[in-house]
Amino acid sequence: MATLSVQPNEAVTFAVAYEHEDVGVIEKRAGLVTQPGKGHEDDTLLNGLFARWGNQLQQLGADRDYGLLHRLDRETSGLLVIALRGKAYDALRKQFESREVRKFYWAICLKKPRTDTGVIDRPIAESTPKKLGEKKLARISGSGKAAQTAYRVLEATKKGCLIEARPLTGRLHQVRVHFDSIGSPILGDGLYAPGPIAAAAPRLALHAHRLGFTHPVTGEAVDIKSKFPKDLRGVLVKLGLKRPDAESE
């Protein structure tokens, strides 16, 4: 067996929502860093992926990010697509670049936006404040890169609202920064929201619940969905909101 570049760690668990010899879709739990870095050398999602698909990911190599095509913030839970072969990675990378991959998030926000549906079109720039060390922050800035997030309000009460967001671009912390910029910060966001809003949920109330793409080899449409996360269901109850996936059970 070839030496693996990333240390496999079977203790890092994740759910497999879809698996094919060329591609997999997994569900990342909140609190899990996507890939190794300072302070997280062997306890990341990628370490767990290597425990399951180490040989395939090793063959892809660092040039193909060991199969990683996109990432989720540490605090965010939800679906990620993983390439298991080079041909699949290259084809899916093109789909991401041409914005053909469809990603949908559920976000529990402080209040309802002015319109029930819309597209937030505000450029985003990155910075690295000294007080946060190497951690990057995103902000709305005219000098930033183009960023668009489509959204629709699923339900709203006087206490809060549930929104489905579809990022059309892939900027750092895009959904979080965009909703904060229109006065609808996501509950539990300890990075961008004031204290009371950050404390209103056990963690960032953001979940990547649906992922759609064209299978890179068969050409078939793949549309994967996940359930509303258990650790955020109590927040919905407190706000008087219904689970968006309740009818599927």
Regions found by a protein language model. Give the residues of each.
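RNA pseudouridine synthases
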Residues: 1-249
